[in-house]
Amino acid sequence: MPTSQYWADSYLQKMVSADDAIAKVRSGQRVFIGSGCGEPQHLVQALTERANRFSGLEIVRLLGRETASLTAIADRTEDTSLNIRSIYLGSAKSPSIARHKRFITPMNMSDVPSLFLTRKMPLNVALIQVSPPDDFGWMSLGISVDVTMAAARSADLVIAQVNPMMPRVMGQSFLHVNYVDFFVEHEEDLLFVPPKQTLSEAPSQIASHITHLIEDGSTLQIGLDAASQATVKGLSDKNDLGIHSQFLTDDIMHLYARGNITNQKKGYNLSLIHISEPTRPNAPSRMPYSA
């Protein structure tokens, strides 16, 4: 475990601007970007602004919101600047794949940390987003842990955007200052997935069939697709449900607040909503939302 002595001095010495941090990235390197709503937007924007200075840069990401349109840059630069490798198939754009602009590494999310940690897919750089450090130098990956912890532990160079808007989330989400090479302080709103205000007829019909199959006491894994979200909305008459999933949505939290989700009959991690996936091989990541 890293020592917390003098961590503040180390933190200040490692603080740089986004431009200076991205200048540490070299052509031909493999760069991991924090996943989903945990994407370090300020760092990604700085990366895109320097894209024409790179050659053969490979961007690795699990699930991206792509606010800086990295795919558009990959398309525009005809493969000379950067390529994007996705581990989550749902984030892929088929035209980009057809033109060899984007690549897919299909695998279970739970296997990805081992891929990084064993260096089967070595990462040269990890761009992540964290909360400010606590009194002992520990920072939280907050709302998006998934495979980011393994990426941060295995990358040759770790650059962290420190955002006061990132909440400290309990569980295996903490990274010490000593594990990070450079810090970029920048406050900005976190990304979010807007809820679908209206659902089409097909997802609603699918959900109506699924909800009849879900019994009281069932443990659920919830996706982000329309049918899954419609199913969650139809579970208000179910009791003692459990959650063991990659994502935590507003509708899931509404069920928890109403008492439909108790996690008492899961058989594993009782009383806990289990969110995300292993951050290292054979070690579950837990976020205890219930007492």
Where are each of the predicted segments found?
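Conserved alpha/beta enzyme-core scaffold
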Residues: 1-276
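Single conserved hydrophobic/aromatic residue that forms the stacking wall/gate
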Residues: 273-277, 281-291
